[in-house]
Amino acid sequence: MILSKDIKLLPGSKVEVLIRVSKNIIQEKYKSLLQDYSSRLKIQGFRIGKVPINIIENKYSEGLKATVLEEVINGSFKEFFKEEPKRPLSYAAPTIKEKDLRLDLDKDFEFTFTYETYPEFEIPSVDSIDIKVEVPEVFIDDSDIDNEIRRLQIENSIIIEDEEGVVKKNSIVKVDFVELDDLLNEILSTKRQDFVFTVGKSETYYDFDRDVIGMRINEEKVLEKSYITDYKFEELAGSSRKLKIKIKSIKKRDLPLIDDEFAQDISDRYDTLDDLKNFIRSDILNVIEEKKEALKLNKFFSTISEKLEIDIPHSMIEAEIEIAFKDTAKQNKMGLEEFKSIFYSSGYVGSVNLKDKILSNLKSKLIIQKMVDLDPIEVTESDLEDEIARQSENSGMSCEEIKKFYEDQNLISYLKDDIKRKRVKKKILANLKELKGKQVSFKDFVNYKICE
């Protein structure tokens, strides 16, 4: 169908394509459609199949051309992308530049479209990279074990009504809240109802945990909040807000006793509380190793990112921002649209820090995927069996069940990609030089800022 095509590479990993389709193809499709109409059309005064062509054209020419136009464009897209290696991103459909396309049956037809594609870049060989990473020496003590025991105790508690009816630290509270303007009118876009949180334990968006202590059921209060310049949510940082809050319910946790029976309730694998504590210690050691690997990989990707110019398309960045919004909304127990409403209504439309963080994460994803794609060693059936066996051991499902799940969901290729990804990360870690860092506690080490 395509007579010729001109392809231009534009900034932002964007591709511009000029497509030309021969007028002979256009005329052929038009005549075929006209003939089809002629054989089926019923017009008063004529038998079906006997309507003169000139009458059909006079009445339906523009509609016929529009149908042919749509068919030609769709056919051109299909033919072009069947051969073109630069594929469009799945979340960014091609866009036709011309606003009002029309067919002229006596001329070749041409149109221009643009689309965003996966960014191209080269990465240096891992073997040629000299990166040193300072890794803290992490120590654990009994308090780390106790903290995990307390977490399990809370998970296995029963939530009951607090008969005292007064908010205290660790109370589970349901509230309604809304921001107020300077005239104390409600800002409806910020209104939340039936928001549930644990006092002193939850990081609420407006940070009103301590402000509700001492309040009673159905009590309403207007809070005046001021936020420091480096507050965790930048849209609130350095600002002052009025917040109306109402207590709707107050509950508490009925905690189980921490003893051998408690350990047995957690899992059949534990006979005593000491068994549970030993498992927790082993699990903490695994977490430390995983965090150390994450720290080293972060260093690798940040170093490589600084050396690379990756022309990331706009739609890819927008998709990552959407993911970041979803994660933040979930952390704050908000719906996505509700969080966006609060986010944008605050006058905060963009953040350099947020964008930098998203770009950094996105670059890391692109780099690791590039390395996975370039990895010449194919995943064998033996590799798949080993990975399925590992997942079986960790999940309690049989190997057959896990394999059937991946096959039924058409995820075998995803599993192979994941195996390659782990192999690439292992190779990266083997080529990094680890320097002994300062001693830190387990609690400090798992803190995000230390592993940044």
Curated annotation (Swiss-Prot):
Annotated Pfam families: Trigger_C, Trigger_N
PANTHER family: TRIGGER FACTOR CHAPERONE AND PEPTIDYL-PROLYL CIS/TRANS ISOMERASE (PTHR30560), TRIGGER FACTOR-LIKE PROTEIN TIG, CHLOROPLASTIC (PTHR30560:SF3)
Family the entry assigns: Belongs to the FKBP-type PPIase family. Tig subfamily.
Enzyme class: isomerase
The name this protein goes by in its record: Trigger factor
NCBIfam families cross-referenced by the UniProt entry: tig (TIGR00115)
Gene3D superfamilies listed in its UniProt record: 3.10.50.40, Trigger factor ribosome-binding domain, Trigger factor, C-terminal domain
Keyword Chaperone: yes
Intracellular or extracellular location(s): Cytoplasm
GO cellular component: cytoplasm
Summary of the function given for this chain in its UniProt record: Involved in protein export. Acts as a chaperone by maintaining the newly synthesized protein in an open conformation. Functions as a peptidyl-prolyl cis-trans isomerase.
Domain topic, free-text comment: Consists of 3 domains; the N-terminus binds the ribosome, the middle domain has PPIase activity, while the C-terminus has intrinsic chaperone activity on its own.
Keyword RNA-binding on entry: no
E.C. code: 5.2.1.8
Keywords assigned by UniProt, alphabetized: Cell cycle, Cell division, Chaperone, Cytoplasm, Isomerase, Rotamase
Chief location bin: cytoplasm
Single GO molecular function: peptidyl-prolyl cis-trans isomerase activity
Catalytic activity: [protein]-peptidylproline (omega=180) = [protein]-peptidylproline (omega=0)
Domain named PPIase FKBP-type: residues: 170-256
Gene Ontology BP, a term: chaperone-mediated protein folding
